[in-house]
Amino acid sequence: MTARSCRNYENDFMSTTIDGSQFPAQGSFAIVVSRYNDSVTRRLLDGAVDTLHAAGISEESIQIAWVPGAWEIPLVAAQFARQSGIDAVICL
């Protein structure tokens, strides 16, 4: 049996931190939120909207769609992604 080396994740891409200052202060954003586990997803939505506002995104530039559960998220996200006026889709 030979010894295995452990992978060093120190310089891996997943260690990169992206903060709100890297968002453009313009654009239209869609947020798709699952109603399932509402007590969690509402708080995630609040955090996402607060982060967009902190980056200078106006309330008018944010569209929110509630869906019943996780299965519907990709369907609605794909519809938003096909719209020419949406710059990013956030799925919660």
Annotate each predicted stretch with a short phrase.
Residues Q22-P68:
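Glycine-rich phosphate/diphosphate-binding loop of Rossmann-like nucleotide-binding domains
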Residues V76-L92:
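Glycine-rich phosphate-binding loop
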Residues E10-V33, V40, A77, Q83:
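Anion-binding alpha/beta catalytic cores of soluble intermediary-metabolism enzymes, centered on
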Residues V67-A78:
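Structural motif
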Residues M1-F13:
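Short, Lys/Arg-enriched N-terminal segments with co-localized hydrophobic residues
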Residues T2, T16-T17, T41, T51:
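Residue-identity detector for threonine
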Residues E10, E59-E60, E72:
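Glutamate identity and glutamate-enriched acidic tracts
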Residues E10-N11, V49, V89:
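Generic N-terminal initiation segments characterized by hydrophobic and/or small/turn-forming residues
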